Each structure stands twice: as structure tokens, then as C-alpha cells.
Regions:
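RNA pseudouridine synthases
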Residues: 1-168
Length: 168
């Protein structure tokens, strides 16, 4: 993508939440380095369909573009897939859906969304990766306008002082 002053990283267009914007060029360089070197702790929240098999687990399938698709998918490393690692923990099981917290250790495009689709629990509202825009819970039917993935918390070194800072 285009290098723009202040923009340190990106979120998918439908993902809500915390975004880091640098105030100076020097800060931007340092913050981008921290993202590239995987020094930033990222925590996302999501509502996924169904219930994960485990209360917490690592999802470590390599990701890449499929041969005939623009979608990102699980692709073996031998076919060009790149390392992708996401830790999740189930916060609450809701019957037809679950509330999870995710910590991606790598920052691949659509990583969390693809990992949950692969697991059979797509993010609610994610039309690209099999998530429907309707959720039925406790006798109610809820329509959602976007996928239910939220960048909840970022922790990184302040670009000037080096002190660890957290934003939610």
C-alpha cells in the first residue's frame, strides 16, 4: 500500500477499534518498526458462529491467496503460504455463537477471519468468509451491518520514551 504520513498500520474496512497514528515522521518510523518486528501486542474481540472445540488454542495455519480466488485462505507453505499464528481464548459460549479474544502473533491480511473460518467458526457478519449477516440467539434474531471483529487493545513502546503504553 501507499506510505502516508501518520498511518502506522491498517484494519480491514469493516473492523472497528484502536488504530495507531503517528504525530511525527520519526515516531512513524519507530512505530512501523515495532509492528514489523512483532513487538506490538494486539488483542481483538470477535463474535464467532458456534462454539470452538477448545477454551483456548493456537491457530497456526499458513495463509496465502488461493489459485483461483482473491480471498485469502489456508495454503501450504510449499504452495506459497506464509506463516500465520493466532492465539484465541473463549470468553463466553452463547450457544449458537461465542465471544472470543484473539491475539495475532503475525499480521497477515484477514488472518483472524481466515483462521476462524478454517476452524469452522466464521466471524459473525463476515460475508467474505462464510459469516452470515444474521445471528439467532436466545430466541432473538439480530441483523448485523458488518463483521463483528474489533481491535480492542494495542500495547507497544512509546516511540520517544520507550515506555510501554496501552490503548483500548
Amino acid at each position: 500500500g501507499e506510505d502516508r504520513p501518520g498511518i502506522v498500520h491498517r484494519l480491514d474496512s469493516e473492523t472497528s477499534g484502536v488504530l495507531v497514528v503517528a504525530r511525527t515522521e520519526e515516531a512513524g518510523v519507530e512505530l512501523k518498526r515495532q509492528f514489523a518486528d512483532r513487538e506490538v501486542k494486539k488483542v481483538y474481540c470477535a463474535i464467532i458462529y458456534g462454539e470452538p472445540r477448545f477454551d483456548s488454542d493456537w491457530l497456526e495455519q499458513p495463509l496465502g491467496r488461493g489459485r483461483q480466488s482473491e480471498r485469502i485462505s489456508v495454503v501450504p507453505v510449499s504452495e506459497g503460504g506464509r506463516e500465520a499464528s493466532t492465539f484465541y481464548r473463549t470468553i463466553e459460549r452463547l450457544g449458537r455463537a461465542s465471544y472470543v479474544e484473539c491475539e495475532p502473533k503475525t499480521g497477515r491480511t484477514h488472518q483472524i477471519r481466515v483462521h476462524f473460518e478454517y476452524m469452522g467458526n466464521p466471524v459473525v457478519g463476515d460475508r467474505l468468509y462464510r459469516g452470515k449477516r444474521v445471528l439467532r440467539l436466545a430466541g432473538g434474531k439480530f441483523k448485523v451491518a458488518r463483521h463483528l471483529l474489533h481491535a480492542f487493545r494495542l500495547t507497544f513502546g512509546h516511540p520517544v520514551t520507550g515506555e510501554r503504553v496501552t490503548f483500548e
